[in-house]
Curated annotation (Swiss-Prot):
Gene that specifies this protein: Dffb
Enzyme's top EC category: hydrolase
Keywords in alphabetical order: Apoptosis, Cytoplasm, Hydrolase, Nuclease, Nucleus
Region Disordered, residue ranges: 319-349
Gene3D superfamilies assigned to the protein according to its UniProt record, in alphabetical order: 3.10.20.10, 6.10.140.170
Pfam families: CIDE-N, DFF40
Protein name (record): DNA fragmentation factor subunit beta
Species per Swiss-Prot/TrEMBL record: Rattus norvegicus
Activity regulation, short description: Inhibited by DFFA (DFF45).
PROSITE patterns xref list: CIDE_N
Subcellular location(s) of the protein: Cytoplasm; Nucleus
Magnesium is among the record's keywords: no
EC number(s) per entry: 3.-.-.-
Amino acid sequence: MCAVLPQPKCVKLRALHSSCKFGVAARSCQELLRKGCIRFQLPVPGSRLCMYEDGTEVTDDCFPSLPNDSELLLLTAGETWHGYVSDITRLLSVFNEPHAGVIQAARQLLSDEQAPLRQKLLADLLHHVSQNITAETREQDPSWFEGLESRFRNKSGYLRYSCESRIRGYLREVSAYISMVDAAAREEYLRVLSSMCHKLKSVQYNGSYFDRGAEASSRLCTPEGWFSCQGPFDLESCLSKHSINPYGNRESRILFSTWNLDHIIEKKRTVVPTLAEAIQDGREVNWEYFYSLLFTAENLKLVHIACHKKTTHKLQCDRSRIYRPQTGSRRKQPPRKQPPRKRPPRKRQ
């Protein structure tokens, strides 16, 4: 027999698929269940009550100890609820499959909202659900291409070009360093630079890193185009879990340009000077090692601007990989200029 309280207990009640929430007063669990079913026009048989917070079922035994103003959920036969986790799951499903109704509702709420924090949350929600991620061509998503040259006809092509441009920029920096190399070693420096250039051309300047249509081993994103921040150079991962999909909309494309391909072992401070020093030493340089440090994911991390630390990394190249193993005769070293000998003074007779 269910316990009947002398004074009614007031709770806030909602149904699983309803955004409405009502205050209901009842002296027993069964009375509350019956009133809730009437309010939401649901069948009583098979229905039950649970705590909205964690999904704990409300029974006759625990009803008397239920605090006033508790938030309860009314479930019908076959429905389940696991607390806030269920609400978060439902919210995430909106991001995967946005509906016009959700977008319209978010816009309406945003237009009426005055609180800055709620405005921010609604704006972020609207930004994400409005993305046209699956679209690829200019015809399918013309707004994404606003401000871009007409030669770019699809998103993957532009993102590939964007990555290639970054890698080409690194190559120009390596080339510009030749002025710092001794004149006797410049020919060898140019030879190494030429080898790197040919290698980059063969892999299309690693533009596949930003291309969601590339092979999984050659890209830094998911097949849908989601990129995750790999964290600062001195951490294994991003503690803030930054992520972005530049394929989604124009704003995301522009924001993605602020993300950095950061060299773990620094390019300007360490890698290029070490390369120049090794060439000037006269031994045969393992240029493929330096290539991997300068232009590949072996030494590059994709990072959100907040995770891009501008401090000195204080990391050095692997000395065991700088030169090729000497299997035969050592490559002839470039001649070094010797200081002129001073003649001894003649003795006066």
